[in-house]
């Protein structure tokens, strides 16, 4: 197993398959990626995952952009499935209604689906497209095939903070987990108008949840808290992702990232942490040399918030 200088094991690899997306959410951080021209081929992704698996990284999440707009998404899942124990995908849900069965058959375990609002006008304002009904159909299909299904709600002040309980009820209705996510930005953007306008702190909400939850659990990843809330005769699982200035969050991060253009990246918010792995792979690097690149990346890891 890979362990960084701060004693944090690295067990998860988050792979961006593309920087492109069929929506245009105004807040999207695009996994912290800069513009690049290279695109990893399925066999290249497979080899990198195989190396990662040898090093104890057994959980992989596929992201984007929107990963399902890649025509070879099913092939990619099928290729990397043998090397991992948990294979998940983060999606905006627009293609799920038609793709869900193929993704499941290829070996996908579970999905996270972005859903910031249940209001069609707001959805179009946030994403640029009027496709909420299509996404809801995809969510309903996914909950029949995958477990668990997580709905990702980025909470934004003045936009959807009034819908938190509506989303909790909806998650209960479709038997999904709701993840409430704070907007996160690097230090240099904390004084930006964007952050001032839209950041909605979730700590007060967690305090409210603590009073009414029938059960509270803590995940190993980031020490995120999961609240089991009684709503409309059901118990709904709500997970809170609160990263800004959260030192506990950073000290319990077990992730390494792989950008769509083939760089290992140690932290979403850093801009100085890219290590090229696709270039050496294409230039004939041996497995041992690729292992060394992973080890170098892990040695570069350090908590962002300290």
Curated annotation (Swiss-Prot):
Entry superkingdom: Archaea
UniProt binding sites for GTP: 14, 61, 90, 150, 255-257
An example Gene Ontology biological process: Mo-molybdopterin cofactor biosynthetic process
EC class name: lyase
Binding site for S-adenosyl-L-methionine: 27, 65, 114, 189
Any Pfam family: Mob_synth_C
Reaction catalysed by this enzyme: GTP + AH2 + S-adenosyl-L-methionine = (8S)-3',8-cyclo-7,8-dihydroguanosine 5'-triphosphate + 5'-deoxyadenosine + L-methionine + A + H(+)
Record flagged with keyword Lyase: yes
Cofactor: [4Fe-4S] cluster
EC number(s) recorded for this UniProt protein: 4.1.99.22
Keywords noted in UniProt: 4Fe-4S, GTP-binding, Iron, Iron-sulfur, Lyase, Metal-binding, Molybdenum cofactor biosynthesis, Nucleotide-binding, S-adenosyl-L-methionine
Annotated InterPro entries: Aldolase_TIM, Elp3/MiaA/NifB-like_rSAM, MoaA_arc, MoaA_NifB_PqqE_Fe-S-bd_CS, MoaA_twitch, MoCo_biosynth_MoaA/MoaC, rSAM
Domain annotation Radical SAM core: ranges: 5-232
Free-text cofactor note: Binds 2 [4Fe-4S] clusters. Binds 1 [4Fe-4S] cluster coordinated with 3 cysteines and an exchangeable S-adenosyl-L-methionine and 1 [4Fe-4S] cluster coordinated with 3 cysteines and the GTP-derived substrate.
Binding annotation for [4Fe-4S] cluster 2: 250, 253, 267
Annotated residues for binding of [4Fe-4S] cluster 1: 21, 25, 28
Record pathway: Cofactor biosynthesis; molybdopterin biosynthesis
GO molecular function, one term: cyclic pyranopterin monophosphate synthase activity
SMART domains linked to this entry: Elp3 (SM00729)
Protein family according to the UniProt entry: Belongs to the radical SAM superfamily. MoaA family.
NCBIfam families: moaA_archaeal, PRK00164.2-1
Biological role: Catalyzes the cyclization of GTP to (8S)-3',8-cyclo-7,8-dihydroguanosine 5'-triphosphate.
Protein name: Probable GTP 3',8-cyclase
UniProt source species: Pyrococcus abyssi (strain GE5 / Orsay)
Gene of this entry: moaA
């Amino acid at each position: 197993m890979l362990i960084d200088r701060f004693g944090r094991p690295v067990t998860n690899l988050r792979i961006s398959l593309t920087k492109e997306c069929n929506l245009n959410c105004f807040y999207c951080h695009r996994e912290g990626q800069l513009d690049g021209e290279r695109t990893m081929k399925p066999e290249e992704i497979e080899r990198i995952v195989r190396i990662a698996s040898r090093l104890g990284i057994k959980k992989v999440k596929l992201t984007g952009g929107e990963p399902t707009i890649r025509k070879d998404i099913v092939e990619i899942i099928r290729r990397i499935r043998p090397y991992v124990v948990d294979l998940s995908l983060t999606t905006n849900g627009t293609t799920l209604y038609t793709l869900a069965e193929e993704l499941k058959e290829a070996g996908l375990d579970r999905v996270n689906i972005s859903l910031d609002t249940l209001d069609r006008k707001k959805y179009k304002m946030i994403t640029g497209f009027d496709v909420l009904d299509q996404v809801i159909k995809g969510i309903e299909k996914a909950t029949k095939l995958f477990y668990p299904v997580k709905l990702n709600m980025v909470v934004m002040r003045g936009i959807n903070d009034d819908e938190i309980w509506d989303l909790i009820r909806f998650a209960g209705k479709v038997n999904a987990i709701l993840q409430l996510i704070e907007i996160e930005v690097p230090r240099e953007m904390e004084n930006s108008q964007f952050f001032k306008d839209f950041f909605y702190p979730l700590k007060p909400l967690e305090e409210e949840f603590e009073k009414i939850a029938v059960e509270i659990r803590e995940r190993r990843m980031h020490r995120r808290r999961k609240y089991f809330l009684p709503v409309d005769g059901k118990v709904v699982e709500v997970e809170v992702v609160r990263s800004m200035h959260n030192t506990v969050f950073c000290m319990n991060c077990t992730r390494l990232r792989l950008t769509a253009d083939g760089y290992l990246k140690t932290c979403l918010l850093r801009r100085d942490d890219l290590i090229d792995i696709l270039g050496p792979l294409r230039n004939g690097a041996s497995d041992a040399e690729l292992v060394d690149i992973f080890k170098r990346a892990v040695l570069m890891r350090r908590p962002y918030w300290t």
